[in-house]
Amino acid sequence: MTEAPTEFPPEDGTPRRDLGSDWVIETLREIKEEALRHFDPRLLIALGYYIHNRHGDTLEGARELIKTLQRALFVHFRAGCNRSRIG
């Protein structure tokens, strides 16, 4: 079995991102688009400010926003959204 190549920080001096950070950012974009189809944008903006104030501009904040939006969309769909694709 061969060893995985060693990771090196970017040459421009920017800090290394966590593994999976690209996935978190892409998932947040996708769930945000879906949430905008179902919720008032003002509500989503207020939620974003709230989470940003608690977690700052971090991956932890992005993960928290994903979890919150997933829960909200799940409840919304279970309550009988007319545009639901899941039931």
UniProtKB/Swiss-Prot annotation:
Coiled coil region boundaries: none
Subcellular localization: Virion; Host nucleus
Pfam families reported in the protein's UniProt record: VPR (PF00522)
Principal place of residence: virion
Summary of the function given for this chain in its UniProt record: Stimulates gene expression driven by the HIV-2 LTR. Prevents infected cells from undergoing mitosis and proliferating, by inducing arrest or delay in the G2 phase of the cell cycle. Cell cycle arrest creates a favorable environment for maximizing viral expression and production.
Assembly: Interacts with human UNG.
Record-given protein name: Protein Vpr
